[in-house]
């Protein structure tokens, strides 16, 4: 359902061409959970952006749910994301002028869902915020904000969820609770999960671990999960 074919990403810098990713290839099956690990600067977030069609590779291509993302213009890639992809980021990316329920309703309304409010309330309840749905992001704790972000990501029942350091701004206890919630929702929905993390214990909960170093894929290993 997700394939990376010899992905390379290069950018110009004052010192010349900078290689961020070099010839990265792998595939991810439907429903699989995959962690992407590596030191800072290894290219993890760049890889995630390419896999989601938020950026295009210098060479190579990504197939997502049967679509070659490099063959599509930005509108075409946006349509694929709207139909197939959910995102959870370290910094939450909630709309500050919308309350929790409205933030979750937003992708449902954009997708033309018949009853966005009812669907959003249902998943808000699932993530444990039944009594906080009317609160705005500024009124929520970090853990609550991430619960809203997770609810928003799963609301449209995406084929694949991309999570970039989703516990990076949370304390260890809150982060553990958030990841337990994310893995539970992932199991229940059979969504494919691609997770960028520095947390080895979190990576071990995934089916596979992809390790990047200096832009190259140096390991692709199955876990005991």
Regions found by a protein language model. Give the residues of each.
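ABC family nucleotide-binding domain
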Residues: 2-214
